[in-house]
Amino acid sequence: MPRTRGTRQSGDSVDGTVALLPVSSTMPRDLGSLLTPAHSALLTMECQEAVIGDHALFPALVEAVHTSGLRRNLGALAGRARAAGVPVVHNLALRRPDGGGSATNCKLLALGRRSSTVLTAGSSAAALVPELGPEPGDYQVGRLHGVSPFHGTELDPILRNLGVTTVVVTGVSLNVGVLGLVIEAVNRGFQVVLPRDCVAGTPPEYVALLLEHTYGLLATIVTSAEVAAAWER
């Protein structure tokens, strides 16, 4: 069987280890069956004013969001999800005014604690960016601690009670939070679809490597247009 340059067949070995197949050959591409509206949900990750708004803590991430068109693309995809009857679930980072219940056991959380902006529930800082609403039928799941949204929240039972088997993961950042969300979803048996134009991280060259070598092994990577088309079939 002919081979293309730079690819390996299953069972090939390098230095005695079994090589992986190219990512594109290992992930499902039948989006019609993977993304049936009755069994899929759109998850947004920390698309909040204090995270990706104009005065957010990490300017480089805000710039990446702007460059990618994430807010516009995700706002449009959320509208298509609602129109198709697909639940939209917003995962929010929240903090009490006194910081109670939130640890600083890693550098990322410690940086957040030192910020003058407090993500108090109901505050403008904790609010979703305008492109995402929320609309009355949306779900909002907050967490006081940690860097990803499944642990210690209602996210898992909400999805299971809605009959969801595939989650479409969007938001920020590909560096940490989205990665935690994707891994936890896989651990819980969900299929994961990742629209590349609805996620962002920094720096760009690292994001490209993450998508190819990490997310490509965990999720079906597509565009928001492909997701919307599958929901409209």
Predicted regions and their residues:
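Active-site-adjacent betaalpha module
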Residues: 2-41, 76-84, 109-233
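N-terminal nucleotide-binding beta1-loop-alpha1 segment
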Residues: 43-47
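Short acidic, Gly/Ser-rich segments with clustered Asp/Glu that frequently serve as metal-coordination loops
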Residues: 48-53
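Short, solvent-exposed loop/turn and secondary-structure capping segments
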Residues: 54-55, 101
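Short glycine-enriched, charge-decorated loop/helix-capping segments at active-site entrances
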Residues: 57-67
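Nucleic-acid-processing active sites and adjacent nucleic-acid-binding tracks
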Residues: 70
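Von Willebrand factor
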Residues: 73, 77-100
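Aromatic- and acidic-residue-enriched segments that line the glycan-binding/catalytic groove
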Residues: 99-113
